[in-house]
UniProtKB/Swiss-Prot annotation:
It is found in: Cell inner membrane. It comes from Bradyrhizobium diazoefficiens (strain JCM 10833 / BCRC 13528 / IAM 13628 / NBRC 14792 / USDA 110). Its main location: membrane. This is Large-conductance mechanosensitive channel. One of its GO terms (biological process) is monoatomic ion transport. PROSITE patterns: MSCL.
């Protein structure tokens, strides 16, 4: 049973999937940083220095805090600023994934469209060609 599992785990699809998950996690961290550290501050600068990650709507009168972390400690809040940031994050990841898949599909189509090389003539055909060429010379 262990041998069977090892064979299953070493199949190309399983290994490819594992590599894809690891690369996807790393890419997700990069996009999260891009959104949180680059895009959202730029949007905040354009909109007058707003920090969307701290935008929330209190769902309880007990919530009097002005930042999200303290507000969550005081009671229920609707953290729509965090949701907005994560939505932008998702859109960027989905768009980049679309571009990658589109590029892969374009490459596949080019490979399929490329004409196949003509098959090498058989030994008999090569021999007959040589005989013909010799007869032409004489």
């Amino acid at each position: 049973m262990l041998k069977e599992f090892r064979e299953f785990a070493m199949k190309g699809n399983v290994v490819d999937l594992a590599v894809g998950v690891i690369i996807g996690a790393a890419f997700g961290a990069i996009v999260t940083s891009l959104v949180g550290d680059v895009i959202m501050p730029l949007i905040g600068a354009v909109t007058g220095g707003l920090d969307f990650s701290n935008y929330f709507t209190p769902l309880s009168k007990a919530v009097t805090a002005t930042n999200l972390a303290d507000a969550k400690k005081q009671g229920a809040v609707l953290a729509w600023g965090s949701f907005l940031t994560l939505t932008i994050n998702f859109i960027i990841i989905a768009f980049v994934l679309f571009l990658v898949i589109r590029a892969i599909n374009t490459l596949k189509r080019k490979e399929e469209a490329a004409p196949a090389a003509p098959p090498k003539p058989s030994a008999e055909v090569e021999l007959l060609t040589e005989i013909r060429d010799l007869l032409k010379k004489s």
